[in-house]
From Swiss-Prot:
The lineage of its organism: Bacteria, Pseudomonadati, Pseudomonadota, Gammaproteobacteria, Thiotrichales. One of its GO terms (molecular function) is ADP binding. This is ATP synthase subunit alpha. Produces ATP from ADP in the presence of a proton gradient across the membrane. The alpha chain is a regulatory subunit. It is an enzyme of class 7 (translocase). It is a peripheral membrane protein. It catalyses: ATP + H2O + 4 H(+)(in) = ADP + phosphate + 5 H(+)(out). It comes from the Bacteria. It is found in: Cell inner membrane. ATP binds at G169, D170, R171, Q172, I173, G174, K175, T176. Belongs to the ATPase alpha/beta chains family.
Length: 513
């Protein structure tokens, strides 16, 4: 087939018109070393701190060390196929994770990929894992209670929405149990929960998922899991990923609760990464910025005002405040709260719940030490009725602890001292609470009223818990209207006091326990 000169010139013209002469700029580097999940890349001149780097085999790295002629990055995934001489590329994006309502009820890894076998997460929304915390002018004071349903916490160490309350103690003494109970107690309150598991066994995480499902709490919970078998890089970024998922709710005028279980393991992972990146070690071999590691994370938990929510949602949500409450967990070694990481986190948070091994072993569970535990801002948020009735409990316990030590050396005690010791023993017994048995505000108030007004003083210590169970059962069946009223209003006045008195005296008269 012969083409005429005009046809040939037409084809050439078409080709010239279709020719794409645009230049795609791509920052390319060469991997000069790879070991222990760390890659060193030469030639990436335009990379930013915290930027994602594309590595061979659809794996990404996170740029952490920016040197004069090289970049040190941690690999977010499998690195065994990466070798010296491979190419690496900047992609111009900071690490992001999926966020949104679709994550509720799911178990995801530190990058937001589902690991629960329930298919893909149906959300297109993403958020950077690192964000600047809201400034002072966007914050609102903490004045709404976050009920844990645990008597000793809600009465003595109250937590408010938007607070950071540290749970600290040795291993295996119930730190996670307190956090899980708090998540379960948010059922029906509208508070969304995020549980971040860092460096835990996969079987432990599976057990927590099962417990939450059994108590109907997975519907309002996201679980972010960086297991013990995951790399140090994933354990390091998991808390930030979980925090971004919680901020989605906070910034839209909702309330969220996030549990970091536990930040000690995150600090260990960060120490490992820093040492592999040849950063100079400091105290306990931690890098110099380990305080900033936790402060920039925990400062993102806040209560934000109406203006912040309205500005963030472009006017779609008006007149609503949002909050993100953080419950970081720190594991101590032999009760040493003066170690580096515990003291750092104590200084960052708004209070701490201190658990003691001796109390746990003596049968007091939750094993909370009321002397060392404090809530710096929760008092303003505490429910009025619990605040009124719980004040006497803390005083009774403090006096009891003081007298208990003294009474070991004294043979004969006066009547007043003996009465204080008796009440202290019964209050201590009353504060025992099994896991998964959280209480409503009204039932908690009923127990505190009975203790505060001396109704437990003439009971044997062994009768306190059975009496409390009978009291709650009676209140829920015969006096359900009073319980509903207290749960709804949370107020305490002479009328409510009279109603509580009638319930307690009715129970004592029946002796149904």
């Amino acid at each position: 087939m012969q083409l005429s000169p005009s046809e040939i010139s037409g084809l050439i013209k078409q080709r010239i018109e279709k020719f794409d002469n645009s230049v795609e700029l791509k920052s390319e580097g060469t991997i000069v070393s790879v070991a222990d999940g760390i890659v060193t890349i030469y030639g990436l001149n335009d990379v930013a701190a915290g930027e994602m780097i594309k590595l061979p085999g659809d794996v990404y790295g996170l740029a952490l060390n920016l040197n004069t002629d090289s970049v040190g990055a941690v690999v977010l995934g499998d690195y065994e196929h990466i070798k010296e001489g491979d190419k690496a590329y900047c992609i111009g994006r900071i690490l992001e994770v999926p966020v949104g309502e679709a994550l509720l009820g799911r178990v995801v890894d530190a990058l937001g990929n589902p690991i629960d076998g329930k298919g893909e997460v149906a959300t297109d929304l993403t958020s950077p894992i690192e964000k600047i915390a809201p400034g002072v002018i966007w914050r609102k004071s903490v004045d709404q209670a976050l009920q844990t349903g645990i008597k000793s916490i809600d009465s003595m160490v109250p937590i408010g929405r938007g607070q950071r309350e540290l749970i600290i103690g040795d291993r295996q003494i119930g730190k996670t149990a307190i956090a899980v109970d708090t998540i379960i107690n948010q059922k029906g309150t509208g508070v969304k929960c995020i549980y971040v598991a860092i460096g835990q066994k996969a079987s432990t995480i599976a057990n927590i998922v099962r417990q939450l499902e059994e108590h109907g709490a997975m519907e309002h919970t996201i679980i972010v899991a960086a297991t013990a078998s995951d790399s140090a890089a994933l354990q390091y970024i998991a808390p930030y990923a979980g925090c971004s998922m919680g901020e989605y709710f906070r910034d839209r005028g909702q309330d969220a609760l996030i549990v970091y279980d536990d930040l000690t393991k995150q600090a260990w992972a960060y120490r490992q990464i820093s040492l592999l990146l040849r950063r100079p070690p400091g105290r306990e071999a931690y890098p110099g910025d380990v305080f900033y590691l936790h402060s920039r994370l925990l400062e993102r938990a806040a209560r934000v005002n109406e203006e912040y929510v309205e500005k963030f949602t472009n006017g779609e949500v008006k007149g609503k405040t949002g909050s993100l409450t953080a419950l970081p967990i720190i594991e101590t070694q032999a009760g040493d709260i003066s170690a580096f990481v515990p003291t750092n986190v104590i200084s960052i948070t708004d209070g701490q719940i201190f658990l003691e091994t001796d109390l746990f072993n003596s049968g007091l569970r939750p094993a909370i030490n009321p002397g060392n535990s404090v809530s710096r801002v929760g008092g303003a948020a505490q429910t009025k009725i619990i605040k009124k009735l719980g004040g006497g409990i803390r005083l009774a316990l403090a006096q009891y602890r003081e007298l208990e030590a003294f009474s070991q050396f004294a043979s004969d005690l006066d009547e007043a001292t003996r009465a204080q010791l008796n009440r202290g023993q019964r209050v201590t017994e009353l504060l025992k609470q099994k896991q998964f048995s959280t209480l409503s505000v009204a039932l908690m108030a009923l127990s505190l009223y009975a203790a505060d007004n001396g109704y437990l003083d003439n009971l044997e210590v062994s009768e306190v818990i059975p009496f409390e169970s009978a009291l709650h059962a009676l209140a829920e069946t015969k006096y359900s209207d009073v319980i509903a009223e207290i749960n709804e209003t949370g107020k305490y006045d002479a009328d409510i006091a009279d109603k509580l008195k009638i319930i307690v005296e009715d129970c004592k008269a029946n002796q149904a326990w």
